[in-house]
Amino acid sequence: MEFSVKSGSPEKQRSACIVVGVFEPRRLSPIAEQLDKISDGYISALLRRGELEGKPGQTLLLHHVPNVLSERILLIGCGKERELDERQYKQVIQKTINTLNDTGSMEAVCFLTELHVKGRNTYWKVRQAVETAKESLYSFDQLKTTKSEPRRPLRKMVFNVPTRRELTSGERAIQHGLAIAAGIKAAKDLGNMPPNICNAGYLASQARQLADSYSKNIVTRVIGEQQMKELGMHSYLAVGNGSQNESLMSVIEYKGNPSEDARPIVLVGKGLTFDSGGISIKPAEGMDEMKYDMCGAAAVYGVMRMVAELQLPINVIGVLAGCENMPGGRAYRPGDVLTTMSGQTVEVLNTDAEGRLVLCDVLTYVERFEPEAVIDVATLTGACVIALGHHITGLMSNHNPLAHELIGASEQAGDRAWRLPLGDEYQEQLESNFADMANIGGRPGGAITAGCFLARFTRKYNWAHLDIAGTAWRSGKAKGATGRPVALLSQFLLNRAGFNGEE
């Protein structure tokens, strides 16, 4: 699908369809008012007859409106004007895209980017429209033998901006929006792949392909079990012992800043391509969704794709920690004591608290890069889902400025995170009689004690932890990966690269 921006008046558009907003109760947006004036009150007469109230998501498709060059006008309800916030704006865009696609409008000029969204500029509105449009049109049908496609799909979308001065920022918004949307799609595709296809080897092959596609800036190295053993990554290796699939750690290095002083930002993604729970096996119900336990790695992969696509002038390293947690004759057990790469020992009380055992070794491994900051992304705890539900990602950090930066980026991107504490009081719950620490700390504050566990391996750099257990995928009828937090991390890196969207 093609996107572009222009600045023009609605009556001069020769497009197949013009999209304008209507507020409650039956109030025309400024652009809709212009069209109403040209058509001698045709639109307002329809509203007076009760054809459209203007409630969020309501639509009315008009054909051959008098004195208007465009074949169709799509009126879309935007709710009350003062209540049009970021969430509602995105819902209106989503409804617009779905309606255009369903009604066979192959091209459209959208004036919704001229609506006032509190505290948001044209760049934000255009970029969010692009990302939302791509999200609305996403489908995962690679493994279906029959694919359903609309007869006349939407192919071209033009966003109108209020002044010619804003064309440049609109074009940049499209460029950024497309790159982020492609990263989200890549993350969703990886997440939705079944575990018999998407194992650690598959993740590694995707990482290598990324380096092939962006060979100018990206180098990928894949570290296998033998090398991990030599590095002393015994905790990571223990988790994969029960699986026939080899554990593989894929390290994707992107260099956008040639300066020797430029330290990299490191992103670490938990890549449990299937988590049965191991010997502490999970219940059968919903176990199929444990293919999504690699959504952290999928998100990191998506972000690395975005960074390479936009050629950001920063250095970023993405680590996909690929592994599979299965029961078997070689599987690690409750009661085992593991020696981590850092030298610290861990008593395993539950083999289903495996993500932290993989991440702790990777967090030690990345010390060699002397990072500016390290952010790990993981579907880590069910406790985070209890604390924050399925709408907001959990954030913990040992560095206040980094935490504030990430929270700010999450608000900018509309991919929200909320900070949880990392107090020393919680560390007591991880005490063990037989090792330096236990791998679980009981039910109270489970998301926080998991963060506290990881914090013991991140003392040499600024670090943040994103627990995406509640936000990485949806269950039920709309089951599928969400691609979060690609948008959040993309915004964070855009800000670091000097593209914060404040035109």
From Swiss-Prot:
Active-site positions on this chain: K282, R356
Residue positions binding Mn(2+) 2: K270, D275, D293, E354
Catalytic activity annotation: Release of an N-terminal amino acid, Xaa-|-Yaa-, in which Xaa is preferably Leu, but may be other amino acids including Pro although not Arg or Lys, and Yaa may be Pro. Amino acid amides and methyl esters are also readily hydrolyzed, but rates on arylamides are exceedingly low; Release of an N-terminal amino acid, preferentially leucine, but not glutamic or aspartic acids
Molecular function (Gene Ontology), one example: metalloaminopeptidase activity
EC number of this enzyme: 3.4.11.1, 3.4.11.10
Keyword check for Hydrolase: yes
Compartmental location: Cytoplasm
CDD domains: Peptidase_M17
Family: Belongs to the peptidase M17 family.
Name the UniProt record assigns to this protein: Probable cytosol aminopeptidase
Organism for this UniProt entry: Enterobacter sp. (strain 638)
